[in-house]
From Swiss-Prot:
The keyword Ubl conjugation does not apply. Transmembrane segments: none annotated. It comes from the Bacteria. Part of the Bam complex. A lipid is attached at C34 (N-palmitoyl cysteine). InterPro entries: BamB, PQQ_b-propeller_rpt, PQQ_rpt_dom, Quinoprotein_ADH-like_sf, WD40/YVTN_repeat-like_dom_sf. This is Outer membrane protein assembly factor BamB. Part of the outer membrane protein assembly complex, which is involved in assembly and insertion of beta-barrel proteins into the outer membrane. PANTHER family: CELL SURFACE PROTEIN, OUTER MEMBRANE PROTEIN ASSEMBLY FACTOR BAMB. Coiled coil: none annotated.
Amino acid sequence: MIHALEQGGVARGIAQAARVAVLALAATAVLGGCSLFSSKNKHEPAKLMEVQQVLAVRQVWSVSVGKSGRYVMQPAVAGNNVYVSAAGGTVTALDGATGRTVWQGKADVDLTTGPGSDGTLTAVAGEKGAVIAFDEKGAQKWKVAVNGEVLTAPLVGQGLVIVRTTDGRVLGLDPSNGERKWIYQRSPSALNLRSSLPMIFAGDNIILGFAGGKLGALSASNGALRWEAAVSYPRGVSEIERLNDVTGAPSVNGSQVCAASFQGRVACFDMSTGAPRWGRDFSSPTGVTQDDGGLFAADEKSVVYGFNAQNGADLWKNDALLWRDLGTPLAFGRAVIVGDSEGWLHFLSRDDGKFVARVKTDGSAIGAAPVVVGQTLVVQTRGGGVYGYLPK
């Protein structure tokens, strides 16, 4: 019997999965949420305490673009615009400062990812491995099939549209017509987290995480593996105990790239060579964010941690959001910002982890990481709300 856990309630579901004593596994079993478990197995989310608004956060615009469904629709930023998508097929470019619609396109399939964009070309992926590209006015430019499930937003830039499938392939597509330029293939793991694994450009490399706790760099020119490093190693006896996939997008600051894994570690490496700089035991279902001095992440219990980005030493932790299914955090200015499953956006001091502000969106989960367009902080909810804020 295959138990496939859909995205949504990721942190709580994965934590519970790790504690299940008896679970029939199959070679293609996947994890990514909590639908397998009845409500009696779920932890009660912490009640929110009143927060003194030390940081003024002003909502400057909001729009509705359509629901995300069971997928994580991560917004993308290019220039002054933010690009968002909805499960029903809508792709929208918004002015980051005003929320004004710059253009809107419509795919003819349901979508499974957020968009990737370089400002000229915007690409999304949909059901049955469809990859659809739109031009700078929102007109569909091409559509191809990559013959595999895609849960990660395409990465667009450097004359490429990069697509990764859940069966271990990474494809470099021609942005003019969608034809394949190169392919990188890994053997799929028997058990892995069924989640979005964003990729980033770093110079002429593509940095991305893999199942089994690995982080790697691919050449953008031909897809060759330039280096691979271990964020963590499998531990334990059962398949679930040994599950240690890299989670979230790699985080780059200067010459350092960092990543976290589930049931594994948080670790940082030299961006050019993959040489390790530091690592420590940690388990995160959503990944990390960093700035010049700190690295920040939430664990599967929704405890938020601050580490010294240079050596991994403890800075602080905040356990007031237990089991609230936090999304991927963002370091922005003097705050670490993270959304939860009830649509709250929490602002923590990056210096000591104390709350400095909190705002409410539409009440639906914020699973994707916030993004910054100019000075505007933008978040997208599963309910389809996109909100622009100015923290002061």
